[in-house]
Regions:
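Beta-strand-rich domains and repeat architectures in extracellular enzymes and scaffolds
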Residues: 1-21, 36-48, 85-86, 196-198
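Short coil/turn segments that connect the beta-strands within blades of beta-propeller domains
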Residues: 7-8, 51-53, 91-92, 135-136, ...
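Conserved beta-strand positions in repeat-built beta-propeller and related beta-rich domains
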Residues: 11-16, 54-61, 96-100, 140-144, ...
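Short loop/turn segments that connect beta-strands within beta-propeller blades
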Residues: 25-30, 68-72, 107-111, 152-156, ...
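Blade-loop segments of beta-propeller domains
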Residues: 29-66, 72-84
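Surface loop/turn motifs at the tips and blade-to-blade linkers of beta-strand repeat domains
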Residues: 35-40, 76-82, 116-123, 162-166, ...
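Hydrophobic, well-structured mid-protein blocks that either form specific transmembrane helices
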Residues: 64-121
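Signature of short aromatic-glycine-proline-rich micro-motifs recurring in repeat-based ectodomains
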Residues: 128, 175-185
Length: 210
């Protein structure tokens, strides 16, 4: 549900009721170095680090959690006013999606600062899900599709798209395999990683312009 890098280390939040976790992951093996398990009533969604804290959204629980980024110790729980989907940051604000065409900019207490409507060719882009801030742009995967849109954070206009169809071969798909749903950028080396719900692989990708 959430995927991001902090100091060259990958972190991941996973969903489903009774299965939701937050994990610090060894990129080489894919195994959890440290793992937080959540009560079965919670369905975790997007997560991100901002100013020394890790923020984690829930889908329908209307709460968000804050943990210390260094120790992964619990700090606080906040009321959250909408469905939690994706979460990223520009280094100043939290930026969240809720499955609509809107992105919500918030402070660290989840107080709304502004709302951005994302449009492509003048039309709102619905079902924005997982988010990642990459080189001054917001990348968002469009839920239930293999498309990522690259968004100008100033005006909400889509400036490009990434076609991820064919990323996961049929040989690695099974009954549990779900949609594209993971974008992570490692600012230390500029690498971009993509994955999906219940995928058995994490892919390092490079864009080819078409």
């Amino acid at each position: 549900q959430g995927l991001f890098f902090l100091d060259g280390v990958m972190y991941e939040s996973t969903g489903q009721y009774g299965e939701s976790t937050f994990r610090k992951v060894d990129l080489a093996t894919g195994k959890a170095v440290k793992r937080l398990d959540f009560d079965k009533k919670y369905f975790l969604e997007g997560s991100v680090e901002l100013k020394g804290n890790i923020f984690i959204l829930t889908w329908l629980n209307k709460v968000a959690f804050v943990y210390d980024a260094k120790t992964l110790t619990y700090k606080s729980t906040w009321r959250y006013p909408r469905e939690g989907w994706g979460l990223t940051t520009d280094g100043k604000s939290l930026i969240a999606s809720d499955g609509s065409a809107r992105l919500y900019f918030m402070d660290e207490q989840f107080k709304q600062q502004k709302v951005l409507t994302v449009k492509m060719n003048g039309r709102p882009v619905q079902m924005l899900n997982e988010l990642e801030w990459i080189d001054g742009k917001i990348w968002a995967n469009v839920y239930m599709t293999d498309m990522i849109v690259i968004i100008n954070p100033a005006d909400g206009n889509v400036e490009g798209t990434v076609d991820c169809s064919g990323l996961l071969p049929k040989s690695l798909r099974d009954a549990d395999t779900d949609v594209l749903n993971g974008i992570a950028y490692n600012p230390k080396d500029g690498r971009i990683y993509l994955t999906g719900k219940c995928w058995k692989r994490l892919y390092e990708v490079r864009l080819v312009e078409r």
